[in-house]
Structure formats: C-alpha cells, structure tokens
From Swiss-Prot:
Record NCBIfam families: rnpA
Catalysed reaction, written as an equation: Endonucleolytic cleavage of RNA, removing 5'-extranucleotides from tRNA precursor
Family, per entry: Belongs to the RnpA family.
Protein name per its UniProtKB record: Ribonuclease P protein component
Length: 112
C-alpha cells in the first residue's frame, strides 16, 4: 500500500482552493481537484488554538485518514485541501472519523 502524500507548499494549497471545487459542512471545508494520485493538505486556522493543539488536531485527522486508507475507503485520484472549522476540533476521535468518512463518500458520489 502506498503512503498518503501530503501537500506542504502554500502555492499548492492556493492552486487547489482557487479551483473552487468544494464540499462544505458544519465541521470541515473540503477543496478538491482531479489528479493522477491522492494527496492531502490539512489546515487548522491559527486563531483556533496554539501550535501544539493545532498539530494535535492535524495528527488526529491524519490518523483517521490513515484508517480510512487502510480500509480501502480512500482510493480516489484527487488532490485535497481539508480545512477544519472550530466546532470540529472538540469532537471525539470516533466522530471525526465518521465525519471524514461521510465526506469521502460524498466525494466519491460527486466523482461520477
């Protein structure tokens, strides 16, 4: 199984966001662009928490994505930017996992 690639550069984030293909929920903003491989960038806005907590939330999201990846629910060829909203942060890990799974199901439905 391949490793999940990550988006790191600001211009890569902006290129995906400027395409304006998005799924918006109460918990996440999810921008996506078709690609030859799966790649994801995670952003937690600076005003929501200090750096330690932002990194903690990013690790939780990455872990949930890794579980989805291992279960085979993420096999799409998209570049994705995931922006967490404030009410997503205090949720339990299981709830975060379910919200991410729901978004990827919607993305799969939008692909067709």
């Amino acid at each position: 199984m391949q490793k999940i690639r990550s988006i790191k550069k600001n211009w890569e984030f902006q290129a995906i966001i400027n395409k304006k293909n998005q799924i918006v929920t109460n918990y996440l903003i999810f921008y996506y662009v078709k690609s030859d491989f799966f790649e994801i960038g995670i952003s937690v806005p600076k005003k929501f928490a200090n750096a330690v907590k932002r990194n903690y939330y990013k690790r939780q999201i990455k872990n949930a994505l890794y579980i989805l990846w291992k279960k085979g629910e993420i096999f799409l060829n998209f570049r994705v930017v995931l922006i967490a909203r404030k009410n997503f942060l205090p949720l339990s890990f299981e709830t975060k996992y379910q919200k991410l799974a729901k978004i990827f199901k919607e993305l799969k439905r939008n692909e067709k």
